[in-house]
Amino acid sequence: MNNSMALSPMRLEIDVLKTFIAVAETGSVKHAAERVARSPAAVSMQMKKLERLIGAPVFHRTEGAMRLSDSGDRLMPHAHRWR
């Protein structure tokens, strides 16, 4: 990756929070991916990264739906502040 395309760690984390908000608002990795212009696989990887960073699941995953967990619910106001 060349320097003009490199993201700072802070920027990367803001992107992860924006993706988190998109998944929470749409309830879907696929629809969130469309909103943030990424592949569904990239969105899933970002959510797994976020969960590793905070040490807890942020979503309850069910067939066809993503619902905020208690940890995700607590994270949401902070995510909105940083986006």
What residue ranges belong to the model's regions?
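Short helix-boundary/capping micro-motifs
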Residues: 21-37
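A short LG(V/I)-centered, amphipathic sequence patch enriched
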Residues: 51-68
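Core residues of bacterial helix-turn-helix
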Residues: 35-36, 47, 54
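The N-cap/first-turn positions of alpha helices
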Residues: 13-16, 40, 72, 79
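Alpha-helical linker/hinge and terminal dimerization helices associated
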Residues: 53-54, 75-83
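A detector for short, charged/polar N-terminal pre-domain segments
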Residues: 1-12, 18
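Alpha-helical residues within the helix-turn-helix
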Residues: 34, 52, 73
